[in-house]
Amino acid sequence: MVREKVKVSTSTRTRQWKCVESRTDSKRLYYGRFILSPLMKGQADTIGIAMRRALLGELEGTCITRAKSEKIPHEYSTIVGIQESVHEILMNLKEIVLRGNLYGTRNAFICAKGPGYVTAQDIILPPSVEIVDNTQHVASLTEPIDLCIGLQIERNRGYGIKTPKNFHDGSYPIDAVFMPVRNANHSIHCYGNDNEKQEILFLEIWTNGSLTPKEALHEASRNLIDLFIHFLHAKEENLHLENNQHDVTLHFFFPFHYRLVKLTKKKKEIALKYIFIDQSELPPRIYNCLKKSNIHTLLDLLNNSREDLMKMEHFRIEDVKQILGILEKK
């Protein structure tokens, strides 16, 4: 466990954030405590409420959403040689914590032979996904039988509630909890005199191990930026701001959006729709990803946001940075 003493300084007006406590309670329970200061009266609550909502509702997670076995007649049946009922096995699969960046649906498998215990370690996963806690229990095989279950893995946010209908192919949907943050709280400490009252925001984050609290904080912050960036763009367009007076602020806080907007403006006089991506010296893997998503010209590319690009199969955040670097040289 790492813990730092919180020092309140009234001599500086520079706003700073800091991790003051960090610990790992178990493989599936991480804790982090952060502070942000100094803030004016009322700002801590504004930031704390928004951040808590983003942490609990906006972050994506990876879960098992379906299990399939042709030998299972229905969800509430029992199988000879297995201690748990099918329903109990499904509930155990629901609790498995996964870590990974994937888009769309991926398949995984469990193939085990009894007698013995089946744990998360027995799940055969795609390369982009890994188990957080290999010891999580799935089933107990009491006889020398083979247990083979096909699994479906998805990445999403919030809750995934299964539809109440019968599946006759041995496929059973699993209610998924995609949220990597288990809980988040904020509190406020006030200091200073009545004339210059200031606040410190304390933010506590508990995660399931698929993200650290610091990673969750960064991701929630980026999601909030993505939500609010549209208002800044609208202000730029409607008021016709001159001389790029907000360039420094935008470049520091919103690097991707800033560079993309500047890049589009810079190339307005160029017939972007006639410049094809195969002229841009992109690496073969990135080029193939773009082509599969029907992105053929620079105009097609600039009309996609970072989120659009990240939804493409096998696309990474490093690829976005590489694309921007190549386009800025054009």
Curated annotation (Swiss-Prot):
Coiled coil: none annotated. Residues 270-330 are annotated as: Alpha C-terminal domain (alpha-CTD). One of its GO terms (cellular component) is mitochondrion. SMART domains: RPOLD. CDD domains: RNAP_alpha_NTD. One of its GO terms (biological process) is DNA-templated transcription. It catalyses: RNA(n) + a ribonucleoside 5'-triphosphate = RNA(n+1) + diphosphate. Its EC number is 2.7.7.6. It is found in: Plastid, Chloroplast. Its main location: plastid. Keywords: Chloroplast, DNA-directed RNA polymerase, Nucleotidyltransferase, Plastid, Transcription, Transferase. One of its GO terms (molecular function) is DNA binding. The N-terminal domain is essential for RNAP assembly and basal transcription, whereas the C-terminal domain is involved in interaction with transcriptional regulators and with upstream promoter elements. In plastids the minimal PEP RNA polymerase catalytic core is composed of four subunits: alpha, beta, beta', and beta''. When a (nuclear-encoded) sigma factor is associated with the core the holoenzyme is formed, which can initiate transcription. HAMAP family: RNApol_bact_RpoA. This is DNA-directed RNA polymerase subunit alpha. It comes from Gossypium barbadense (Sea Island cotton). The lineage of its organism: Eukaryota, Viridiplantae, Streptophyta, Embryophyta, Tracheophyta. The gene is rpoA.
